[in-house]
C-alpha cells in the first residue's frame, strides 16, 4: 500500500484503453468507397472463400471490411457504410459492411435475422 506522500508525489495512473476500431474515430459508423473487392481464405481449421472489401474511409483510413450474407452487389467505387466488429478467422479484418445501406443491397430471400442483413419484410 502506498503512503500519502508517495501518492502526492506520484499519483495513480489511469489505464488507457486502446480502441479496437481506430478508423471509426469514435463514431458508430463511417462512409467509405471500395477500392478493391475480393475473396480470401480463413485461418486454420476453417476453410472457405470469405468476401471482403478494401475501403477508403472519410476519416482517411484504408481498412479491410467483411461483407456478410449470401451474395452481394459490391464492386470498385461502390459507396458503403462500415461498422465495427471483427471476423475471428480473418486476420486484419476488424470492420463489417452494413447491408442495405448506401450502395450495398440487402440479402435476397432472407426470412430470419433480416434486420442484420438489410432485408425488407416479405409479403406474408
Swiss-Prot record:
Protein name: Small ribosomal subunit protein uS12
Stretches for region Disordered: 102-124
A Pfam short name: Ribosom_S12_S23
Function: With S4 and S5 plays an important role in translational accuracy.
Keywords, sorted A to Z: Methylation, Ribonucleoprotein, Ribosomal protein, RNA-binding, rRNA-binding, tRNA-binding
A molecular function GO annotation: rRNA binding
Assembly and binders: Part of the 30S ribosomal subunit. Contacts proteins S8 and S17. May interact with IF1 in the 30S initiation complex.
Superkingdom assignment: Bacteria
Gene name, Swiss-Prot/TrEMBL: rpsL
Gene Ontology cellular-component terms listed: small ribosomal subunit
